[in-house]
Amino acid sequence: MSAKIIDGKQVAQTIRNQVAAQVQQRLAQGKRAPGLAVILVGVDPASQVYVGSKRRACEEVGFISRSYDLSATASQEELLALIDRLNDDADVDGILVQLPLPAHCDTTQVLERIRPDKDVDGFHPYNVGRLAQRIPALRPCTPKGIMTLIETTGVKTHGLHAVVVGASNIVGRPMTLELLLAGCTTTTCHRFTQDLEQQVRRADLLVVAVGKPNFIPGEWVKPGALVIDVGINRLADGSLVGDVEFETARNHASFITPVPGGVGPMTVASLMENTLSACQDYHDQAL
């Protein structure tokens, strides 16, 4: 059996088209376009690529995009002051601080400074807590995008045994919460997990987010499993691979995301959805 490939690019394009149509509808009603402020500290090449893709997506859907590029030596006080100004700006619906930050910045303090109703990345403890309480508001973008991809397969998640490999605050932990909300029996594996192979082999739904190339051997994948590969790793020859050994895994799985072109585009598409939601759900009423 060969798995069906879940085309994240296509699904993400559909979402962007839907968001763009809603923006045009807003403008036709005399309402303003949603606004997203993107803050980049320093000149990390990978971060610049990610920020560029987010800015292009804003242009495509018709958002007002604002860019704030601070030097790597900018103080935490400068960054917090900028966030405070954007929190008070009625034309800004979403504030995104590109991670990672320079070592002298306290990431937790910076993310907590963003107003929860403008936290379109979904990283604020308030929004993660809402998800844990089963009343999600602005949901973390990558897990949100993954749930959208799973929905497109038609696979019913209730009762599935889901395994998440990786426990980061950005993907692994909120992904576990999303899968619990979707009715899965969910196991989270991390650096201290003793029996990783056995856990992976039991997974009806496998999500891997560790940032290590081909970390999960394809033969570990349970026959018929749905595999979501969040990792994107560049090898010495310049090629991109995920955290799962793709060619072997696709012969076991029923559905699998490719790398690139799987989860990555969905993260940005979910950011567009969150920004529109923040505008409509929280800020329109303030006008």
Curated annotation (Swiss-Prot):
NCBIfam families: PRK10792.1, PRK14186.1
Subunit structure as annotated in this protein's UniProt entry: Homodimer.
Pathway(s) annotated for this protein in UniProt: One-carbon metabolism; tetrahydrofolate interconversion
Cysteines engaged in disulfide bonds, as pairs: none
Stated family: Belongs to the tetrahydrofolate dehydrogenase/cyclohydrolase family.
Entry protein name: Bifunctional protein FolD
Catalytic function, reaction form: (6R)-5,10-methylene-5,6,7,8-tetrahydrofolate + NADP(+) = (6R)-5,10-methenyltetrahydrofolate + NADPH; (6R)-5,10-methenyltetrahydrofolate + H2O = (6R)-10-formyltetrahydrofolate + H(+)
Keyword Calcium attributed: no
PROSITE patterns in the cross-refs: THF_DHG_CYH_1 (PS00766), THF_DHG_CYH_2 (PS00767)
GO cellular component, one term: cytosol
Gene Ontology molecular function: any one: methylenetetrahydrofolate dehydrogenase (NADP+) activity
EC numbers, comma separated: 1.5.1.5, 3.5.4.9
InterPro entries linked to this entry: Aminoacid_DH-like_N_sf (IPR046346), NAD(P)-bd_dom_sf (IPR036291), THF_DH/CycHdrlase (IPR000672), THF_DH/CycHdrlase_cat_dom (IPR020630), THF_DH/CycHdrlase_CS (IPR020867), THF_DH/CycHdrlase_NAD-bd_dom (IPR020631)
This protein's UniProt keywords: Amino-acid biosynthesis, Histidine biosynthesis, Hydrolase, Methionine biosynthesis, Multifunctional enzyme, NADP, One-carbon metabolism, Oxidoreductase, Purine biosynthesis
Organism from which the protein derives: Aeromonas salmonicida (strain A449)
Entry's Gene Ontology BP terms: L-histidine biosynthetic process; methionine biosynthetic process; purine nucleotide biosynthetic process; tetrahydrofolate interconversion
